[in-house]
Protein backbone atom coordinates (compact mmCIF):
# COMPACT_ATOMS: atom_id res chain seq x y z
CA UNK A 1 0.00 0.00 0.00
CA UNK A 2 2.78 2.43 0.93
CA UNK A 3 4.72 1.50 -2.19
CA UNK A 4 1.66 2.22 -4.36
CA UNK A 5 1.19 5.63 -2.74
CA UNK A 6 4.87 6.44 -3.19
CA UNK A 7 4.69 5.46 -6.86
CA UNK A 8 1.63 7.66 -7.41
CA UNK A 9 3.31 10.62 -5.71
CA UNK A 10 6.49 10.07 -7.75
CA UNK A 11 4.57 9.95 -11.04
CA UNK A 12 2.64 13.10 -10.16
CA UNK A 13 5.85 14.88 -9.17
CA UNK A 14 7.64 13.87 -12.37
CA UNK A 15 4.66 14.93 -14.48
CA UNK A 16 4.54 18.34 -12.80
CA UNK A 17 8.32 18.69 -13.17
CA UNK A 18 8.06 17.94 -16.89
CA UNK A 19 5.51 20.70 -17.41
CA UNK A 20 7.40 23.20 -15.29
CA UNK A 21 10.74 22.65 -17.00
CA UNK A 22 9.40 22.26 -20.54
CA UNK A 23 11.05 24.60 -23.05
CA UNK A 24 8.46 27.15 -24.12
CA UNK A 25 10.19 29.20 -26.80
CA UNK A 26 7.24 31.59 -27.12
CA UNK A 27 6.90 32.23 -23.37
CA UNK A 28 3.30 31.03 -23.62
CA UNK A 29 2.14 31.73 -20.09
CA UNK A 30 3.96 35.05 -19.88
CA UNK A 31 2.40 36.23 -23.14
CA UNK A 32 -1.00 34.88 -22.09
CA UNK A 33 -1.05 36.80 -18.83
CA UNK A 34 0.25 40.05 -20.29
CA UNK A 35 -2.28 39.81 -23.13
CA UNK A 36 -5.12 39.18 -20.67
CA UNK A 37 -4.03 42.19 -18.61
CA UNK A 38 -3.94 44.35 -21.76
CA UNK A 39 -7.44 43.17 -22.71
CA UNK A 40 -8.75 44.09 -19.27
CA UNK A 41 -7.37 47.61 -19.66
CA UNK A 42 -8.60 47.89 -23.26
CA UNK A 43 -11.79 45.83 -23.88
CA UNK A 44 -11.75 46.68 -27.60
CA UNK A 45 -8.53 44.64 -27.93
CA UNK A 46 -10.31 41.43 -26.95
CA UNK A 47 -10.63 38.69 -29.58
CA UNK A 48 -14.28 38.29 -28.61
CA UNK A 49 -15.06 41.68 -30.12
CA UNK A 50 -13.50 40.89 -33.49
CA UNK A 51 -15.90 40.04 -36.27
CA UNK A 52 -15.57 37.08 -38.58
CA UNK A 53 -16.51 36.76 -42.23
CA UNK A 54 -19.50 34.50 -43.00
CA UNK A 55 -19.64 31.84 -45.71
CA UNK A 56 -18.67 33.05 -49.25
CA UNK A 57 -17.36 36.41 -48.04
CA UNK A 58 -13.88 37.69 -48.94
CA UNK A 59 -10.92 36.85 -46.74
CA UNK A 60 -7.13 36.86 -46.86
CA UNK A 61 -4.98 33.75 -46.90
CA UNK A 62 -2.42 35.05 -44.38
CA UNK A 63 -4.97 36.51 -41.94
CA UNK A 64 -8.12 34.39 -42.33
CA UNK A 65 -11.13 35.76 -40.51
CA UNK A 66 -13.71 33.15 -41.51
CA UNK A 67 -16.21 32.16 -38.82
CA UNK A 68 -16.53 28.39 -39.17
CA UNK A 69 -14.80 27.72 -42.46
CA UNK A 70 -11.51 27.95 -44.33
CA UNK A 71 -10.18 30.73 -46.53
CA UNK A 72 -9.73 29.27 -50.03
CA UNK A 73 -8.72 31.58 -52.89
CA UNK A 74 -9.73 34.68 -50.92
CA UNK A 75 -13.26 33.38 -50.18
CA UNK A 76 -14.56 31.79 -46.98
CA UNK A 77 -15.65 28.25 -47.76
From Swiss-Prot:
Sequence similarity: Belongs to the conotoxin O1 superfamily.
Domain notes: The presence of a 'disulfide through disulfide knot' structurally defines this protein as a knottin.
Cellular localisation: Secreted
Predominant subcellular localization, coarse grouping: secreted
Classification via InterPro entries: Conotoxin
Propeptide position ranges: 23-49
Residue positions where Cysteine amide is found in the record: 76
One GO term describing the cellular component: extracellular region
Cysteines paired by S-S bonds: 52-67, 59-71, 66-76
Tissues expressed in: Expressed by the venom duct.
GO terms, molecular function: ion channel inhibitor activity; toxin activity
Name of protein: Conotoxin King-Kong 2
Keywords on record: Amidation, Cleavage on pair of basic residues, Disulfide bond, Knottin, Neurotoxin, Secreted, Signal, Toxin
Signal sequence residues: 1-22
Pfam families for this protein: Conotoxin (PF02950)
